Amino acid sequence: MSDPVFIAPKGGLTLGSVAEACGVPLPDGADPAQPVTGAAPLETAGPSELAYMDNARYGDALATTRALACLVSPRFAPRVPAGTIALVTRDPYRAYAGLLARLYEEAMRPGSLFAAAGVSPGAHVHPQARLEDGMRIDPGAVVGPGAEIGSGTVLGPNAVIGPNVRIGRDCSIGAGATLTHALVGNRVIVHPGARIGQDGFGFAMGAGGHIKVPQVGRVIIQDDVEIGANTTIDRGASRDTVVGEGTKIDNLVQIAHNVVIGRHCVIVSGVGISGSTTLEDYVVLGGQVGVVGHLRIGMGSQIAGSSNVNRDVPPGSRWGGTPAKPVRTWFREMTTLARLAERGGKDEAEG
């Protein structure tokens, strides 16, 4: 549940303003002036709070909810109880996300741990760093020579910004994160502990020992990217590692040198992407997916969790398994194996 001690909802919202923001019409008889004080799950929502429902599993919770209003798809609208206003939309979850963004604006981007604006006396900023007005740097943060940081950006405690790194406006760099050899766009969120721009894993291997290959590329992070806690993004060997506009990367992801990730991709926790692989726009990688190097995953493709991708994936594909293959083929193989295993067990019992 939300706790105002940590994140307080925005005041002054009404049912009418919320419905307008979500692009949902109010039904006849609903009072647009009714105050909205928060959002909560169906089971706990109170008479001044909003909820949403888009899964038949929660039908019982919908039937007993006390919420002021509920965002629902046309399919579930008839099941909304009489005491709750049905706000009908084709995508309840997306509308609910818009509602939460209005109610809890401060949760949209991690802020400074300290109320004071400007540079904390406990931070270490090199005299040759260039800082725009209106930013915040928390105690323990380090900013190297030649670094540029835009207005509205927040550096958390003990964040380290290396020499000549450029960070755009309205970004959030979490506590203990490190950025070197990187160019970062606007409205980028880097969560605590992330490591961006360190050496890629490059060695010329041989019987006489392994020779380190200098990694002289950069990391380019475009606008509106979000990078999860303890994720690591290596800089390029000779070309750049790139993360495209609007891409969202979960916690504990490893992105190797020279990887190019397109726009609006989604990469879930535990993924590892080997060097020089390209993800085109709108690719989704489920949790713990492994991708070998020098591949191309086509635009709009989706890879099921725990899969291992060892060859190129055509655009618009849905693949899964180890090694990954089209989902229909994978399911058919799994079904066949299950039947063979069951038949083998019966044969052993009869024998």
From Swiss-Prot:
An MF annotation (GO) of this entry: N-acyltransferase activity
PROSITE patterns associated with the record: HEXAPEP_TRANSFERASES
Pathway it works in: Bacterial outer membrane biogenesis; LPS lipid A biosynthesis
Enzyme class: transferase
GO biological process, one term: lipid A biosynthetic process
Catalyses which reaction(s): a UDP-3-O-[(3R)-3-hydroxyacyl]-alpha-D-glucosamine + a (3R)-hydroxyacyl-[ACP] = a UDP-2-N,3-O-bis[(3R)-3-hydroxyacyl]-alpha-D-glucosamine + holo-[ACP] + H(+)
GO cellular component labels: membrane
Catalytic residues identified in the record: H257 (proton acceptor)
Keyword line: Acyltransferase, Lipid A biosynthesis, Lipid biosynthesis, Lipid metabolism, Repeat, Transferase
Self-association and partners: Homotrimer.
Function (record text): Catalyzes the N-acylation of UDP-3-O-acylglucosamine using 3-hydroxyacyl-ACP as the acyl donor. Is involved in the biosynthesis of lipid A, a phosphorylated glycolipid that anchors the lipopolysaccharide to the outer membrane of the cell.
Record-given protein name: UDP-3-O-acylglucosamine N-acyltransferase
Record lineage: Bacteria, Pseudomonadati, Pseudomonadota, Alphaproteobacteria, Hyphomicrobiales
